[in-house]
Amino acid sequence: MESPTLADWVGDIETFTGRQWQREPAVFTPEALAPPFDLDVLDAAFDGGLLRTPYLEMVRSDKVTVPTEAYTTSRVVNGVTHEGFADRAKVIERLRAGATLLLRCVDQWHRPTGELVARLSEELGRRVEAFFFLTPAGGQGLAVHRDDADVFVLQAAGRKTWYVHDAPAAADWSLGELPDDERSRQRLHRVLEPGDLLYVPRGFAHRAVGAAGLSAHLSLTIRDLSLQDLRTALAQQLAEGSALPARPLGQAAIADACGTLLGQARERLDTIGPEDLLLAARAASLPPATPTRPESFAETARAWETGGPGTGRPGLGSVGRTWRRLRAAARATH
């Protein structure tokens, strides 16, 4: 594993991969851990007025469902009512009542978080997602559960007590909340403070309780492959290079297509090894390559005014100047 980003967080990568990676939970205190999403950024997101469900959710671990209308409001746009916009006053009220604020897929709508996620994904060759949690002291947003991902927790504010338990005992384990009758040995008990980083291996059961103030942390989930990912990749590998018509016409043509597909699959199976399948599945699981940052509207406007792209259609500024010249000329003739 090579990852400059992780090296900044956990120190020596070889030591981390040999001792902790997918083996053991651990807490690190990097010299300078600055989560890209914190309480100031959260306030800015609310100030912008566009934060809404499904990116916004409030949760409790005590099986009490927090209804959407308890923390959102509606807006009327062009005569149509739209629901699900974040309401800060309602959110704070729910926080005071013990609920946790959960922001999903922060990397999709906050550029600095998206840049961190893209960098980490490229370094690790894994799909990465970002979630933000805000929990009051004594509050617990999620019951003890297992994630289908390795998780890095970046503590941004307040304090939170974490309990991490054993990995699944069975190979065919289930993600999500643990059944009431399942017991799992505790492996780590630690209070995180701002600047701390917690690593939770994939599948290790865990829960967290607010310890002091409003606890804020950013969770980065590092996804890995499932059996379905491998099956999908295998199907794609077996079908690769097939030039059969998409819609065979008639029963004879359909039967011929069956025979051809089976023959091609047998030939391809002889050339595909486990490593080939693994690489194909990993490649398919990654998000599309991040494009170069798109041209901004300000850049477009500057190019428009200076003879760049779009000069065939004058912008509003040039239209205004033309109108003023015509008006001045008309006045001069009278």
Which positions does each model-derived feature cover?
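Fe(II)/2-oxoglutarate
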Residues: 1-7, 180-191, 207-334
